Amino acid sequence: MDEFHRYGKEDSSWQQCFLYPLFFQEDLYAIYHDHYLDGSSSSESMEHLSSNDQFSFLTVKRLIGQIRQQNNSIVFFLNCDPNPLVDRNKSFYYESVLEGLTLVLEVPFSIRSKYSVEGMNEWKSFRSIHSIFPFLEDKFPHSNYILDTRIPYSIHPEILVRTFRRWIRDAPSLHPLRSVLYKYRNSPDNLQKSIIIDPRVNTRFLLFLWNHYVYGCESILVPLLKRSFHPRSLSHGSFPDQTHFDRKIKHIIRNYRRNSLKSIWSLKDPRIHYVRYAERSIIAIKGTHLLVKKCRYHLPIFRQFYFHLWSEPYRVCSHQLSKNCSSSLGYFLRVRMKPLLVRTKMLDELFITDLITDEFDPIVPIVPIIGLLAREKLCDISGRPISKLYWTSLTDDDILDRFDRIWKNIFHYYSGSLDRDGLYRIKYILSLSCAKTLACKHKSTIRVVRKELGPELFKKYFSKEREFDFPAFSSKAAARSQRERIWHSDIPQINPLANSWQKIQDLKS
């Protein structure tokens, strides 16, 4: 593989490299074999693989040969054998072939993504999730509309093969991919006759297909949007007198609409920003309502022709940030006006100016979070704490750790919101539910539990000092954090409650 990477650096015709011989390299399947044995949680499968015949690379090569011959007796995604041990053994070999197929196809994809994406109109598709919230905080105040879209999961298998064929000219390496995709498409369980790629299914093969497909879509869509809505214009940036600048522009347009409409339109400087997490993408636009209507019209057409699917179930929702809120990433996203008092001293005179700026203000969805806590049997639908009977068989430390972990995850994820009064209501619900669970376990009352365990025990687990696990945080830093927005570095592990609430919002929309 290092040889292929070297080849990709030196020669621009790396598309002509032959990947098919890599399928017969035993190292690929040995890596998956060791990974399967190390990560398997089933002792029965471990005993079966160790007691049965040893892992045979010859069997893997024969399976690859049968794929090339289009042998219909091989069904990758169906369990046809009544013997569970034989069926598990077959499934293991088929998964190893898929793993090898994925590893081989990742070689040119990694080369292409590393050396080609840098030149696409200064757009880079690989960004860490750590930068999503700071990106929204930086770009949303300078936008007035957002478009919220969802990328479809259902994809025709031939579309996937064609996207690979654009940059892989080795036809034999595409035959195994086409065979696997079409066998799954024609299976009796698949009624839609298309590939359902769910990135939440943690398989290397599906994740690779999803990432590659979304990468191909974004590599066309985002540069197209950049070129369409970024004209050469006089950009006034985000100066304090931007409001007065816009008033002057409106005055000029009103007086000279007939003569210089095109030149004045270039001064308006429409801007567009794109961000995506999982299957949801957000397009922030600074422009007129007509521009937003054009985007809403062209985006479904682009998706319909590129995805070859009817895009009505994945409609584009537009929101005006100054009036409406958009639900995304577990927040209600909005932009609010923030007054600023500026004092300017010139010689002996002091001038005071009131300015109004836009500020990104994410809102914590307290009511939906309480509803999700009610589904987890931590409170009722009105927010009244109840005991978690399922946890009464655990030790006291385990119960306290679980409640504390829930509170810590919620607070860390929603620490980007400045309005935290609702968060402390969630803290009260969790702490009282924890006390009721301990009281139910010991068959006593909450007062007795607090008296026996002591109030310091609850302060230890639900204290504000534990909200910051960094020794560099002092008391002054903790006090300052109440007035400042903090995006913690562990937010890539998105809270399950936020994900569940987002699914409910998607079903409603």
UniProtKB/Swiss-Prot annotation:
Its main location: plastid. It is found in: Plastid, Chloroplast. Disulfide bonds: none annotated. GO terms for biological process: mRNA processing; RNA splicing; tRNA processing. It comes from the Eukaryota. GO terms for molecular function: RNA binding. GO terms for cellular component: chloroplast. It holds the Pfam family Intron_maturas2. Belongs to the intron maturase 2 family. MatK subfamily. Usually encoded in the trnK tRNA gene intron. Probably assists in splicing its own and other chloroplast group II introns. HAMAP family: MatK. This is Maturase K. It comes from Abies firma (Momi fir).
